[in-house]
Structure formats: structure tokens, C-alpha cells
Amino acid sequence: MSGNTFGALFTVTTFGESHGPAIGCVVDGCPPGMSLTEADIQPFLDKRKPGQSKYTTQRREEDKVQILSGVFDGKTTGAPIALLIQNTDQRSRDYEDIKNLFRPGHADFTYHYKYGHRDYRGGGRSSARETAARVAAGAIARLYLKRYLNLDIIGYLQQMGDLKLQFENENEINKNPFFCPNNKQTQELADYIDRLRRQGDSVGARVKILARGVPTGLGDPVFDKLDATLAYAMMSINAVKGVEIGAGFNAVEQLGSYHRDQMTAKGFLSNHAGGILGGIATGQPIEVSIALKPTSSITTPGQTINTEGEEVTVVTKGRHDPCVGIRAVPIAEAMMALVLMDHYLRHKAQCK
């Protein structure tokens, strides 16, 4: 199975399955000399880990990270950094009933027909459990970008189902279990999740990610555009079905006289481009929005087929998120960091 490595100079290779003994990653290309401990990485994993509130999956994982290599005396050596996260709360028995079935909307069908042999427990390699390794790797990138470039990345829930969230206060984002920038709407979100659980259903979401302090010039033309890499990175996240940069699809209805980001001696007058022109960073905040589908792991019975091609009814058991968009916030932040870190190293290698 290929497709497990991301990046050109700052590369991340993830490994492991949802119900295997552990997941992890190998980060290669991290510059030497950066202070790094497990305690530096852990807060980022704590934002993503399951079982923290009743509004997400009740699978409870500590997600304690171990640094196995690439760090000596508290500093990176330039060697590959291996990170390991133990799986401790698997309940594989929940999946016995569906080991020969294809859950609608999941990768069961495609993995089976591509590889002929799949790990059905919790989705195996296709599970969002894999993203914990991305968050751990992204933490290293974020720490470097913050310390050496003063670059900040922040993500938040922009919409859940038909409930649109008004951006009120950035400081409120990490003070509630929804990564909501408006504390006045958190009760609406809680009620929404409770209603979905009672109905045995799920809903999609929209997440926004901002990067501030991005140096002008990051990115390359044509095929390696910064926005092209960001779209590629975001689309690799489980359940993501759409990506917008800046104004995104709203640009369809905008006039050129409005959409163009006019410039003055003091800077740009708007940021409809989302901080990127010609695939290269303008120095403005980079703005990315992603759309996530509703998970198909629901208790409402549905039609499917089994490995013999016979029509059957399936009910998904196990512990799942009514809205996967909530925990997608730290994952999307991590992917933004990995892209920017990689492009920063590529920029340094080519330009002064």
C-alpha cells in the first residue's frame, strides 16, 4: 500500500491501524537544533484525542506520544524523528457483525476490491485514528514555524449542518468542546448533537483554518502552487469533500472590481485571494475552508451488500462522532502546518 508519505523536504510517513497495537509516524527533514520534548507535542494531541466530551466519540485514548529517535539532549539532531502513540481502548468486537459487509459511505468496499484483504476493525488504515499521527507531526512543524517565523495557525468550526456560527472572539475557540468562536452558540451545538444521537444520525460541517505571519514568497508556480498543495493536504483528511481558498466558490458571484485585492503603499485592501496569488504567499493571512461529509457510521439501518455481493441490511455499532467536523479542527491545523513547513524549507533551498 503506497500513499503513506506527505511532503517534499519536510516529510511525514504515518503507520498503524485503528485497532492495531499502535499508530505513529516518522518525520524526516526537521532542521537540527530545535528544542523538542514529548511535552511540547502533547497539547496538540490532547486537542484531537477522543473521549473528551459527550459530543464526540466515546472511545477513550490517552494519545500519549513517545519520541523514539531524532532528538538528543532535548534538541532535534536532523535525523528522522519517530513518534509512537499506543492504542489502548480498542473494542474490536463491535465490528464482528460487519467484517463481511461493506458499510455505505466508508472505504470498506474500495479497500476490499483494491487489496483483497482488509482490516475491518474500526476501518483499519482508513480510520480517522490515523490522523493522530498527523497531529503529532504537525506539532513539530507548528513549533518550528512559531519559534523561528512567529507564524500562527488557528482553526475553528464555521458551520455544523445548517447551523452557521458567527465569529465573535478568537479566545473562545479553545474554551469549548466544539472549537466554536462564539460562546453564545455552544448550547445550540450541544442541543444539535444530542438530537442527532437520539435520531441515530450524523451531520456534516465546515471548518476554517487561518495562518498568520506567513512570509511573502512561500510557494512555487504552476504544479507546486501553495494553494494547490494546501488543497491536496486538506483533501487527504478523512471525510473532507471540498476545499476553498479565500473567497472560494463565492468568487463565482463576485465582480472582478470587488474580488480583486487592490493594493496601496500600506498593503492590500482586501483578502479575497486568501493570502495566495499565482501559487505564492502574499504575506496576508492564508484562509482555507473545508467541507466535511456526515459520517456513515450511524445506528439507522441502511442497505448494503456483503463480500458475496448479496444485499443485506447494516447497522453500525461502535463509538462514533455525530459530527466529525469537530475533531477535524486540530487535524486541519496540523495539515496547514505541514504544508507551510515544507514550503518554507523549499523556499530556503531556492531563494535568498
Curated annotation (Swiss-Prot):
Gene Ontology cellular component annotations, sorted alphabetically: cytosol
Cofactor: FMNH2
UniProt binding sites for NADP(+): R48
Residues given in the record as FMN binding sites: R125, S126, S127, N238, A239, G278, K293, P294, T295, S296, S297, R319
SUPFAM superfamilies cross-referenced by the UniProt entry: Chorismate synthase, AroC
Alphabetical GO biological process terms: amino acid biosynthetic process; aromatic amino acid family biosynthetic process; chorismate biosynthetic process
Catalyses which reaction(s): 5-O-(1-carboxyvinyl)-3-phosphoshikimate = chorismate + phosphate
Swiss-Prot/TrEMBL keywords: Amino-acid biosynthesis, Aromatic amino acid biosynthesis, FAD, Flavoprotein, FMN, Lyase, NADP
Disulphide bonds in the chain: none
Enzyme Commission number, as recorded: 4.2.3.5
Pathways per UniProt: Metabolic intermediate biosynthesis; chorismate biosynthesis; chorismate from D-erythrose 4-phosphate and phosphoenolpyruvate: step 7/7
Superkingdom as given in the UniProt entry: Bacteria
Cofactor note text: Reduced FMN (FMNH(2)).
UniProt GO MF annotations: chorismate synthase activity; FMN binding
Function (record text): This reaction introduces a second double bond into the aromatic ring system.
Family of this protein: Belongs to the chorismate synthase family.
Subunit structure: Homotetramer.
Protein's name in the database: Chorismate synthase
Organism of provenance: Legionella pneumophila (strain Paris)
Organism lineage string: Bacteria, Pseudomonadati, Pseudomonadota, Gammaproteobacteria, Legionellales
